[in-house]
Amino acid sequence: MTAQDRLRAARGFVLDVDGTLVLGTRDGGDFTPLPGAVELTGLLADRGVPYVVFTNGSAKSPGYYVDALRALGLTVPDEGVLTPVSSAIDVLTARGHRRVLVLGTRDGIGAPLTDAGLRPLFTGEHAGADAVLIGLHRQFGMADLDAAYDAVSAGAALYTCSEARFVATATGDKLGTSRAIAGAVHAVTGVHAELVGKPSRHAVDTVARRLGVPAHELVIVGDDPELEIEMARRAGALGVLVGNDGSADADLRLDGVDALVAMLEPTHRR
């Protein structure tokens, strides 16, 4: 089956955010939609094709992204955005973790954990943590490293939202902090953080459950060969690389999601 055949037969779509549907600024400012983003989400919604928007960012909650993307004219269902915290919650819950030291933001990580019935803990109030979750944390400091060391040394499991080095923005690549923080914690504990965001199998499983679609029948669209295309490879899904001139071995390579719209418009029916 060709890539085009698999695209036509796909039962669900996973759409990246930064560099795929929109571009933000390095300071986290307003998003600008990329060509085809509004049309792609509208097309999938109109045809009843299940899809989720999956960002590897953990600074903001899924609800924030729903509102922000809708404000740009994109069609996004109420529960249509996933972040690494979404898959983290699945993992933490399945493994019986309840008290989670958060190295990240209260809005992006703390609030979703609370909504899921878990208890987020922060530096200075972290006694009894049974897990540590690393996310975007630009104010990370020695007190946080001490807290992580205490928790992991006492037996807490260590997880990270992302291993991405950079995030695409309209004003240039922005450093992803999760990877650096995980490296610092490893340096003092000897423990490697387990990845729960893209491209991990945990992320694949969360998407498949949310959409009710087998992973191998998904189309995963993004601009990062190390994230979306690798995620597609692990899932056995169709990987569509957009806006990237690298040498990644993607199933389809397109200039942007507007080209994907052009391919889907005459052909895709559920």
Q: Which sequence ranges carry the predicted segments?
A:
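Conserved phosphate/oxyanion-binding catalytic-loop motifs
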Residues: 57
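Active-site environment of divalent metal-dependent phosphoester hydrolases
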Residues: 60
